[in-house]
Amino acid sequence: MRRAFFLAALALAGCDGAAKEAPAFPPADRPVASIISARWSNEEARDRVNEADKIMDLAGIDPGMTVADIGAGEGYYTIRLSQRVGEKGRVLAQDILPEVRDKLAERVNRERLDNVSVKLGLPGNPMLPAKSFDRVLMVHMYHEITAPYEFLWHLHPALRTGGRVIIVDADQPTQDHGTPPLLLQCEMEAVGYRLVEFQQTAFAGGYLAAYDAGGKRPEPNAIKPCALRKPAR
């Protein structure tokens, strides 16, 4: 019954998002990395350094939580999130590529992960139901979001009270498949998020930044785009 209710909420979220006229958002004022693979690194290598457990610990992901795995790819985190939140928790695994979504759905069914749902999102809208998630996890994919302000704006209402967006990325230029922390903070704050925690995570290839929805979400036409400028000489 709980799974059916969750799936119904996802369906309603998709219908609501499609029915409304799309507002105008500013484009990203920096390069956007292309999607080159559904996997960031080999799962066995990641498990050798206990990556997923360490990230979930830092993110405060506990049994019974509802978590969205955005840009889930082949499901490295999806599988481990399912184990962490347990039968009383829920995991939504989302990707924007239909073929990746389909392969992940096959894996979820094969491994009988009854607390996991798999959903197709849009580049500028994760299509998540409002006030539904304790954590939203994005690992090594933020730099691939083609419309970050639109995406983050639509994501904002999906957090529950006390919910957090957890971003893991490399501290390098976006065109090199990373996001400089100051640029990330600027883009997040521009859409109404607030930085609540920052940790270096060399074992996961970069850093972890946690944001809540404590700021006010502006109207789309009031969002001021960010860019890292080279200092004047």
Place the predicted regions along the sequence by residue:
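Conserved class I S-adenosyl-L-methionine
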Residues: R164-E187
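A short SAM/SAH-binding and catalytic strip from SAM-dependent methyltransferases
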Residues: D134-P148
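Class I SAM-dependent transferase core
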Residues: D16-A68, Y76
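A short acidic, Gly/Pro-enriched loop at the edge of an enzyme's catalytic core
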Residues: P126-V136
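Class I SAM-dependent methyltransferase SAM/SAH-binding core
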Residues: A68, A72-P126
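C-terminal motif of bacterial Sec signal peptides marking the signal peptidase cleavage site
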Residues: L12-G14
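A short glycine-rich, Lys/Arg-flanked "PGG" loop and its adjoining helix->strand segment in the class I
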Residues: S82-Q83, Y149-R164
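Core SAM-dependent methyltransferase catalytic element
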Residues: T201-R233
